[in-house]
Structure formats: structure tokens, C-alpha cells
Amino acid sequence: MSKALLKFVRLSPTKARLIARQIQGMNAELAIASLEFTPNKAARVLSKVVASAVANGSLDAKSALIVSCRVDAGPVLRRSIPRAKGRATAIRKPTSHVFVEVAEGKEMKSSKSHKKNQAEGK
């Protein structure tokens, strides 16, 4: 089992968790391929962290499974923007800590059509 951790990424944790939930339990190679075509900053970051976790354990991406994929909230950078009448309002720039754990395995996440065929006995 190998791990990779990327801290203080300028990325909203709520937006990154949407992508992280999709790849949990997937084959690492399949996850990297699907993240490559996801038009999202979080997908690019998660793809690199998954690849790093696979490399850290000297595993083959075809046989590696994503055991856990977690996105925790980091510190929030606070900035201000000038407004009318001499005022200023706050801007929050959230950061995240991305944690991916990969283990050796053979199973792949089943697609809906595969599950449907199994239920029908095909």
C-alpha cells in the first residue's frame, strides 16, 4: 500500500471532493484516464497525486486500486477587494490537502452496463 499527499493546493475542497468521490475504488489506470478528460482543475491535481501514489509504491497502474481518496480543507487565504465609498470586502481563497492511498489489486470498478448484464445472467 502506497500513499501520496499534496498539501496547500489552491483549490476549493468542496469542488475537489466531487471529483475525489468519483475515483474512489477505481483502478488507478482507469482513474487517471477518466480524470484526463474531466474539464476541472481538481481533476488535473488529483490525476497527478494518483500517479505519484502509484510511483511511490513502485506499482503497476493497471493492477493498482485507489483504496482511499480524501480532500481535507487547508488554511484559507484572506484577501480584500476595494469597493465603493472607500470600503473593502473580503475575498476567501481556500486551500486543500489531497491524500490518495493506492494498493495492489485486480478488481476494477464495474460499469452500469456490466452490472445490468450480471443481473440478467448474461
From Swiss-Prot:
SUPFAM superfamilies: Ribosomal protein L22. Disulfide bonds: none annotated. HAMAP family: Ribosomal_uL22_B. NCBIfam families: rplV_bact (TIGR01044). Transmembrane segments: none annotated. Belongs to the universal ribosomal protein uL22 family. The gene is rplV. It comes from the Bacteria. Keywords: Ribonucleoprotein, Ribosomal protein, RNA-binding, rRNA-binding. CDD domains: Ribosomal_L22. This is Large ribosomal subunit protein uL22. GO terms for biological process: translation. GO terms for cellular component: cytosolic large ribosomal subunit. One of its GO terms (molecular function) is structural constituent of ribosome. Part of the 50S ribosomal subunit.
